[in-house]
């Protein structure tokens, strides 16, 4: 049973819960793709949506450290299984192979002790990789190299492909957050923590005086790291929090430079630059954008001029509210029978396996407003190789923003 079938199966058993191609122009988002334009969670298995009262240290990595403090395993940087050779942190053989169709299929097996809700949470975290990148996690058949995802003593992973069956520990309870699962899977793909980049001193200052000697190796810099020619990402799912490993309450161990007020770390999951790095490392061509905003707008590339042929783009909207309302202001897609050519499709969640809110829609009639049941909504735009039209323009708001507008009125 592959990932798609497992998701359908678990969705049937249980109620649903809850790049880089750079986009042409964007505001109020950090975006990824050539065919779109942009302006501008909560079950126990989704990283909770942030609130205005969240602590700046309430980030994914600090949750990992809290769980791992009782682990008996020796871990580098808090959650990485040491390799036999230090030079392996820049090895070309640590990456998973790409198939002829451009997809990177990574076999996995799941711990049989996981319950159905644990499985659902892990599969939903995996599904975002498949939606936003060319990484597909597939159930193992007979492959030699594969991931063993099990509930061991904490949240941890190997760095990259090590050969044979390799463990990704996702402990029941403490590690069952989408952001944590994605953090550990990103290690398995071959990514280190963001602060260990060779160019990190241009972007952050390490406050060594607040780091105990035993923890200083966790802040080492890899001089030969592969930065992929992409910017440093303060909001990466792989970034430490500002006070990670501090030995003095209230004193930061990592300070952004030159602007120390920049927030580092987050609790939602993959960032746009995380997605961009995956796609560049694995030579993927994906048109995908993550929008972390309470309101904004999006439109097809070239709008109001005609969009391009053979487009396949997605936008993942993540808000602080429970619900998202999508309103199409203009809509003009080539009409075909059953909308099998060009279409827009909207999902109630973060992947193409999520429930459908608006099925394939084409033509020139403006669709009715679409409202999600959670803080996540995915919009998919697909075109074939035939004639095109002017495309679409849409705006979105969160329930929180709507309440504010209603209060003012």
Swiss-Prot record:
Cofactor binding note of this UniProt entry: Binds 1 zinc ion per subunit.
Swiss-Prot/TrEMBL cofactor(s): Zn(2+)
Prosequence residues removed at maturation: 20-86
Name assigned to this protein: Astacin-like metalloendopeptidase
InterPro entries attached to this UniProt entry: CUB_dom (IPR000859), Hatching_enzyme_Uvs2-like (IPR017370), MetalloPept_cat_dom_sf (IPR024079), Peptidase_M12A (IPR001506), Peptidase_Metallo (IPR006026), Sperma_CUB_dom_sf (IPR035914), ZnMP_hatching_enz (IPR034039)
Stretches for region Disordered: 30-55
The entry's keywords: Cell membrane, Cytoplasm, Cytoplasmic vesicle, Disulfide bond, Fertilization, Hydrolase, Membrane, Metal-binding, Metalloprotease, Protease, Signal, Zinc, Zymogen
Species for this entry: Coturnix japonica (Japanese quail)
Listed GO CC annotations: cortical granule; cytoplasm; plasma membrane
Low complexity composition bias: residue spans: 30-42
Cross-referenced SUPFAM superfamilies: Metalloproteases ('zincins'), catalytic domain, Spermadhesin, CUB domain
Sequence ranges assigned to domain CUB in this UniProt record: 287-399
């Amino acid at each position: 049973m592959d990932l798609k079938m497992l998701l359908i199966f678990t969705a049937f058993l249980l109620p649903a819960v809850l790049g880089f191609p750079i986009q042409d122009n964007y505001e109020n988002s950090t975006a990824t793709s050539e065919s779109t334009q942009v302006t501008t969670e909560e079950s126990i298995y989704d990283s909770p949506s942030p609130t205005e009262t969240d602590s700046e240290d309430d980030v994914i990595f600090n949750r990992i450290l809290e769980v791992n403090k009782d682990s008996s395993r020796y871990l580098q940087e808090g959650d990485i299984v040491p390799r036999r050779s230090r030079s392996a942190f820049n090895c070309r053989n640590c990456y998973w192979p790409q198939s002829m169709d451009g997809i990177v299929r990574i076999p996995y097996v799941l711990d049989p002790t996981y319950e159905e809700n644990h499985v659902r949470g892990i599969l939903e975290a995996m599904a975002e990789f498949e939606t936003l990148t060319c990484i597909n996690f597939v159930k193992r058949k007979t492959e030699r190299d594969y991931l063993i995802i099990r509930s061991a003593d904490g949240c941890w992973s190997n760095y990259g492909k090590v050969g044979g069956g390799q463990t990704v520990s996702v402990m029941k309870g403490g590690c069952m957050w989408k952001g944590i699962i994605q953090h550990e899977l990103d290690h398995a793909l071959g990514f280190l923590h963001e602060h260990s980049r060779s160019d990190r001193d241009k972007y952050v200052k390490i406050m060594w005086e607040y780091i105990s000697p035993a923890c200083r190796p966790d802040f080492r810099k890899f001089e030969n790291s592969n930065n992929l020619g992409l910017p440093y990402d303060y909001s990466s799912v792989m970034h430490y929090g500002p006070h990670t490993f501090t030995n003095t309450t209230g004193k930061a161990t990592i300070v952004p430079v030159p602007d120390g007020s920049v927030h580092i770390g987050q609790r939602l999951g993959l960032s746009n630059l995380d997605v961009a790095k995956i796609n560049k490392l694995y030579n993927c061509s994906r048109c995908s954008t993550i929008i972390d905003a309470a309101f904004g707008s999006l439109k097809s590339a070239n709008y109001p001029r005609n969009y391009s042929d053979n487009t396949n783009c997605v936008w993942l909207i993540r808000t602080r509210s429970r619900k998202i309302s999508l309103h199409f202001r203009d809509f003009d897609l080539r009409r075909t029978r059953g909308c099998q050519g060009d279409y827009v499709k909207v999902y109630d969640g973060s992947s193409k396996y999520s429930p459908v809110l608006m099925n394939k829609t084409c033509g020139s009639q403006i669709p009715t407003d679409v409202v999600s049941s959670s803080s996540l909504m995915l919009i998919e735009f697909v075109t074939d190789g035939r004639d095109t039209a002017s495309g679409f323009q849409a705006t979105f708001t969160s329930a929180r923003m709507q309440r504010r507008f209603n209060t003012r009125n």
